[in-house]
């Protein structure tokens, strides 16, 4: 049962997240050979000021 976590900035609509979750689910089913109802997608929305790359703010 894949649990897929997506970290992103806040601001996407519920419709955008739903469409993205469906696309992720479709890929997981095709690639991982799992059932649709076994795929869980979790969105974690963190403000941009919490994101760093190589120790530097994005």
Model regions and ranges:
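A domain-level signal for the structural core that forms small-molecule/cofactor-binding pockets
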Residues: 2-58
């Amino acid at each position: 049962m894949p649990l897929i976590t997506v970290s992103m900035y806040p601001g996407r609509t519920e419709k955008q997240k739903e469409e993205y979750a469906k696309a992720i689910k479709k890929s997981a089913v095709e690639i991982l050979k799992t059932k649709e109802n076994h795929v869980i997608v979790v969105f974690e929305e963190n403000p941009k000021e919490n994101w760093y790359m190589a120790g530097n703010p994005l």
